[in-house]
């Protein structure tokens, strides 16, 4: 999730119904391009698996996971309970928990799968690495798996920056802005390295490129990616109003980008990239 401790509800981006719809759409996009929800080779036919979803938001990932597993125990955590669902799958519980804080002692070594998606960007790289290591410690030694999905704001190749110049401008502006919030603009490029440095076994990675708008051969998926990104640009404009003085970045800097990027998406396209990395705890 997108965390900023001094915001009213704990999130940098807005937390209204529109943002909830965007997060659901983003979940569906990533799942489509992953090919399936869980890439870690769990024993799916084994009953009573224990699964954690860190940064669960409204629990949609857990809801999908509940249809794949046999009588699992599902645990969702987030920095804010605002989006926790009133209607929950059986054997599902939700807890308020920041990735920067110690986890409950009794959770250590207890999960068959620890999952997290698009969360680690909300802290600086060194803190992000330690946050992932604390999550790994929650997996069962020898048999427990972790699966992390992250993106980066510097994923365009030099050729793609020429092809999608407005998207490149947006990424450069946000990459300059995020360190002022103590965010990491490139976590997707670091996760595999961190997991291998920890000593995880059977580490694998899947890189997903999602064409935006006119660049997507599937019009429905292209439109979903376009709407998702337009709302992201708008949300970062709002976030820029919270920047301290002297950063050299203004919310108004996003206005021409928001105007031009819509045209670029509808005429040329764009690219989103996400990295999913999974491995087994030794």
From Swiss-Prot:
Top-rank EC class of the record's enzyme? transferase
Which N-terminal residues, if any, form the signal peptide? Answer: none
- Record GO terms (molecular function): methyltransferase activity
Q: Which residues cross the membrane?
A: none
Q: Which domain of life is it from?
A: Eukaryota
Report the pathway entry: Mycotoxin biosynthesis
Entry-linked InterPro entries: SAM-dependent_MTases_sf
Entry keyword set: Methyltransferase, S-adenosyl-L-methionine, Transferase, Virulence
E.C. number, please? 2.1.1.-
Gene3D superfamilies noted in UniProt? Vaccinia Virus protein VP39
Task: State the similarity comment.
Answer: Belongs to the methyltransferase superfamily. LaeA methyltransferase family.
Q: What does this protein do?
A: N-methyltransferase; part of the gene cluster that mediates the biosynthesis of gliotoxin, a member of the epipolythiodioxopiperazine (ETP) class of toxins characterized by a disulfide bridged cyclic dipeptide. The first step in gliotoxin biosynthesis is the condensation of serine and phenylalanine to form the cyclo-L-phenylalanyl-L-serine diketopiperazine (DKP) by the NRPS gliP. GliP is also able to produce the DKP cyclo-L-tryptophanyl-L-serine, suggesting that the substrate specificity of the first adenylation (A) domain in gliP is sufficiently relaxed to accommodate both L-Phe and L-Trp.
Record's protein name: N-methyltransferase gliN
The UniProt gene name for this protein comes to gliN
């Amino acid at each position: 999730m997108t965390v900023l401790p001094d915001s009213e509800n704990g999130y940098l981006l807005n937390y209204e119904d529109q943002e909830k719809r965007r997060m659901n759409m983003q979940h569906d996009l990533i799942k489509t391009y992953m090919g399936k929800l869980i890439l870690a080779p769990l024993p799916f036919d084994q009953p009573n698996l224990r699964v954690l979803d860190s940064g669960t938001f409204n629990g949609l990932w857990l809801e999908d996971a509940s249809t794949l597993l046999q009588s699992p125990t599902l645990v969702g955590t987030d920095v804010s309970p605002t989006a926790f669902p009133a209607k929950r799958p059986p054997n599902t519980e939700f807890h308020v928990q920041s990735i920067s804080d110690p986890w409950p002692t009794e959770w250590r070594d207890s999960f068959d799968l620890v999952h997290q998606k698009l969360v680690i960007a909300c802290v600086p790289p060194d803190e992000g690495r330690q946050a992932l290591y604390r999550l790994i410690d929650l997996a069962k030694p020898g048999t427990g798996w972790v699966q992390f999905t992250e993106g980066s704001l510097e994923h365009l190749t030099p050729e793609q920056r020429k092809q999608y110049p407005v998207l490149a401008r947006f990424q450069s502006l946000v990459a300059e802005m995020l360190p002022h919030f103590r965010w990491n603009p490139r976590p997707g490029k670091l996760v595999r390295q961190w997991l291998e440095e920890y000593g995880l076994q059977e580490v694998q990675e899947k890189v997903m490129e999602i064409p935006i708008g006119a660049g997507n051969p599937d019009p429905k998926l292209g439109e979903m990616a376009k709407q998702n990104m337009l709302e992201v640009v708008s949300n970062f404009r709002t976030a820029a109003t919270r920047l301290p003085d002297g950063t050299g970045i203004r919310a108004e800097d996003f206005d021409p980008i928001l105007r031009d990027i819509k045209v670029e998406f509808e005429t040329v396209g764009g690219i989103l990239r996400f990295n999913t990395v999974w491995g087994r705890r030794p």
